[in-house]
C-alpha cells in the first residue's frame, strides 16, 4: 500500500472486485483506504483486487481448486501498515506497563498457538502440546504473552488476556519483543510492525511467497513442498513433526 500511495498520492484505494468492497478491520484508521459506499466522494479511485477467492498469492485452477491451493510462486509478500487509534495504543501501553512493573527484566514474547478452523488450516498446525513445551522450557527466561478470543485454547504459564479482537492483539504485539506463531494473520501483523518473529511454515506454503526475510521462517523443503492440500495431509504432518521444540527454542533465544 505504501508504494501505491507514493505512486498515486492523490488517489484513494478500495479493496474489492471493481463493484463492491471487501472491508477488513485491519483497514480501519487508514485514510488511504475507503469503502465502496464512499466512492462518489473522491475523483481518483484505484481498486485493489485482493479479497476472498481472489488472492494474489494463489493461482485459481478450476481442476484442482477443491482439492488444493495452488500457489503463485511469483508473488512476494510486502510489509503492510497498521494505523492504530489512540485508544488502541493506550490499551496496549497500559497492559505492557503493568507486565513490566511486575516482571521488569525479561523480554516479552507474544505467542499464538491457535489457527483458524477452516479447510486446509489443519495442515499448518504444529501442535498445541509443542507450543506448551516451548513455554514450559523457556518460562524462566522470558515472559510469554497470549491474547485470545472466543474458543481459542489458552496456554499455561503465560500471561493471557482473553476476548481481545484482532486489532487490539496487533496493538499488544506492537509492544512485544518477539512474535512466535504459525504462518497467518499475526505473522503479517508482526512484519507490518517491524517485529522480529519465529514463524512456522512446515511444508504447506513457502516463506518465499508469504514470508518475510527478516523473520526466522521454519520450513521443510522436500519434493512435495509446498503442497497446499486442503484435506488432512500426511506430508504436512510429517513436515511439522520435523520442526522440533528445540528448533523453535533455539530460534527464540537467537532473536532475543
Identify the meaning behind each predicted range.
Residues 1-256:
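Catalytic machinery of carbohydrate-active enzymes
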